[in-house]
Amino acid sequence: RNCEQAFDASTHNTERPRAGRGVPSVDMDDDRTDTRSPEEKRAAHTDSHPGLADRLGPMALYCTQEAGTERAFTGSLLDEKRDGAYRCAACGEALFDSDDKYDSGSGWPSFTTPSGAAAVDVRTDSSLGMVRTETTCASCGAHLGHVFPDGPGAAGERYCINSACLVFDERPDD
């Protein structure tokens, strides 16, 4: 199965509020702040969702759980132009919005900002002989991609995200 078929709303974590459009931000000093590493979050999420490997499929499992990267220009969401939200393939948490997606020419879906300040976590990634900033799902720790300081706009950030790590939900017409 592909990532678009992977999200199961019955396993979606709705207990922890997330920041985003129309959702109040979480106070980072609040005692609900999750201080676990992405690896600890991934392990806990995988342990509590034993069907995750079957649900995600090989590429999404490799990218989200092993910090893998799909080949450039091969992702199913690279050319997605519809209005909607991009969710974590592993847990269903809202991560990015189509309003913030743009064509960076990199070969991966690119966004100027996450859907909310608490949607993603970032940390230094010094693997593969280079220093980058890794982006993970703040809710479950799934690897998403990397953020680079060469994006458009005032913040100048480019969130370069694997399609396999995302599920797209089209926004209904009003």
Regions found by a protein language model. Name each.
Residues 20-22:
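Residue-identity detector for glycine
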Residues 26-39:
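N-terminal targeting and processing segments of secreted/endomembrane and organelle-targeted proteins
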Residues 36-174:
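A short Gly-Trp-Pro
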